[in-house]
Amino acid sequence: MFDFMTLEKVREKGPLVHNITNIVVANDSANGLLAIGASPIMASAKEEMDELAKMADVLVINIGTLDGELVEAMKIAGRAANVAGTPVVLDPVGVGATSYRRKVVQELLAEIQFTAIRGNAGELAAIAGEAWEAKGVDAGVGSADVLSIAEKVANEWSTVVIISGEVDVISDGTRFAKVANGSALLPRITGSGCLLSAVCGSFIAVQDDAFRASVEACASYAVASEYAELELERKLPGSFRPLFLDALASWSVEKTHAKAKIQESGEHK
C-alpha cells in the first residue's frame, strides 16, 4: 500500500503550507518544509486568515506558545479552512501541561474539523481523557495503551491520529500502522515533532487519503533522520541538526523503501 510516491507529489506540486506555529520552531519548520519541496508561509495575523485559507493547500496549527490573539487567529483560520475545503492539522503541544492549554484545545476541537492530529503519547492521552503523567511539553509516562488512545481520539473527532515516539502509531480509527524508524537524536533537538506535524501537513495536502499520507510522512521523516545520523562523526545534537536538514532535502523513494519499517493492520485487537 505504501509506495512513498506522496513524497514525489510534494516535490512536484510544492504545496503551500500555512503554519500558525510557535516562536521556538518557526525558523526550523520553515527550513524543513523548504527542504522537502513544500512552500511555507508563517502567518498569524487574524486579519489575513480568511484570505490565506483560500490560498493555502493545508493549514497547520501548533499551540506551542499561546496567547489570546493567536488563539483567535487559529479559530478564524481553522473555520475558514473548513469552509474552503483545506485540510487542517493540529499539533497540541503540551496540552496536558496546563488548564489553559487544555481549554484552548477543547475549543479548537469543538470549532474546527481537523484532518489530522499529531502529538506525543502524553498529549494525545490528555485529549483522550486518559491518565498520563505529562512532563511539560514532553511525552512523560503513562500506562494507557497507545493504540487504544489513537483509536479513541480518531473515532471521537473523525480524524487521523499520529502519536510520535520511539515507534510512531498512526490510526484513522479503523486502520492502524506502526513506524519503527528514527534516530535517537531526534528528541534531542527542539522542534523535531513540530516539523513532523508540518511535514505530515504537506503530505496530506497532496494525497487524498490522509491516513496513507501520514504513514508515509512519518516513515520518510524517520528514515531521513537515520541517514543523517550515519553521516555523523560524533553523535551530538548540534552536528545532527544541519545533517538532518540535508537528509530531508535528499530524500528519495528508494532510500525510504530500503529502510522503512512499517507494520499495518486493519483493526486494533
Swiss-Prot record:
| CDD domains documented for this protein | THZ_kinase (cd01170)
Pathway(s) annotated for this protein in UniProt: Cofactor biosynthesis; thiamine diphosphate biosynthesis; 4-methyl-5-(2-phosphoethyl)-thiazole from 5-(2-hydroxyethyl)-4-methylthiazole: step 1/1
Please give the Gene3D superfamilies that the UniProt record associates with this protein: 3.40.1190.20
Reaction catalysed by this enzyme: 5-(2-hydroxyethyl)-4-methylthiazole + ATP = 4-methyl-5-(2-phosphooxyethyl)-thiazole + ADP + H(+)
Any one GO BP annotation for this protein: thiamine diphosphate biosynthetic process
What are this entry's molecular-function GO terms? ATP binding; hydroxyethylthiazole kinase activity; magnesium ion binding
Q: InterPro entries, alphabetically?
A: Hyethyz_kinase, Ribokinase-like
Q: Which residues bind ATP?
A: R118, S164
Is Protease among the key words of this record? Answer: no
In terms of SUPFAM superfamilies, this protein maps to:
Ribokinase-like
Q: Where does substrate bind?
A: M42, G191
Q: To which protein family does this belong? A: Belongs to the Thz kinase family.
Q: Spell out the HAMAP family in the cross-references.
A: Thz_kinase
Please describe what this protein does. Catalyzes the phosphorylation of the hydroxyl group of 4-methyl-5-beta-hydroxyethylthiazole (THZ).
Protein name from the UniProt record: Hydroxyethylthiazole kinase
What species is this protein from? Listeria monocytogenes serotype 4a (strain HCC23)
Encoding gene, per UniProt annotation: thiM
